Amino acid sequence: MTEYKCSTQPSSSNCRTKYRTYITAIKSKPFLILAGISGTGKSRIVRELARACWDVDSNEYETQKPRNFEMIQVKPNWHDSSELIGYVSRIGADQNGNGISFVVGDFLKFIAKAWEEPDVPYFLCLDEMNLAPVEQYFAEYLSVIESRKVDREGNVVTDPILKQNAQSWYWNLCTELTDDEKLRAQFRDKGISIPQNLIVVGTVNMDETTFSFSRKVLDRAMTIEMNDVDLYGGLTHRYEQIGKVSSEHLVGNAVEGVDVYESNKDVCDVVINYLQEINKKLEGTPFKVAYRTRNEFLLYIVIISRIIRMILARSYL
């Protein structure tokens, strides 16, 4: 297994302090929820982080929608994953099953695009994701995100979000999703899984028109509340002045506490002792800190401690 020792060394020194929280959270886990009052720029932040992955003089930086960004507006009538991933259609098929096809959802298309460009972070923004029950329309992703693990080559892999199938419709689907023959073969042999460079960010407004989140969803995501507003923000520059953000900033190569503990025992032990004290206070309740929360604490602290050391050395900002 590749040793993970706070490996957040950026490729540039221009990241702004304002975005450090978002970048660190994403690197800790590529599923982020931005919650707050309406109009605070939650979806804009996602778009600007995607834009910041490109050089300022490139076409992707100047365009309204960089190719590594996709926004999907959640609809209140979503109760399964057919709008996001897709569904098998039997329209036009005969009794023997000939002519069955797969209607591809935008999320699955974007997954394939991210696989084609593994060195570029790809951002999917689910806008107002709690307009519908997240546990229903996003069930496959919520399950698969928990299957993440580091393989022998040091890559983060997941179970397939769409399993391999021997039927002709699946073969045709793989052909439709990508022109890359190697990637087609991977999809056909192993199914379609979540690439390491795919970052999912949901924006949330809490009001009487939305659904509340279950613990299942909150446990699986990094959550940031956005209720502060700078009324001078965005008046002097068309785009956010983030600086160049590379894959090294955003794509993590650790998933569990075991991936970071041995190389960072000093800081990890401080975190564990703190969490143990919390659990003592929560004894006898169903709210004690468990392994998933512990792991995410460790990953976040290891990453942010590395950033702080670089700031003190003036090599990050």
Predicted regions and their residues:
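Alpha-helical lid/collar subdomain of P-loop NTPases
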Residues: 237-317
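AAA+ P-loop NTPase catalytic core and its hallmark functional loops
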Residues: 1-251
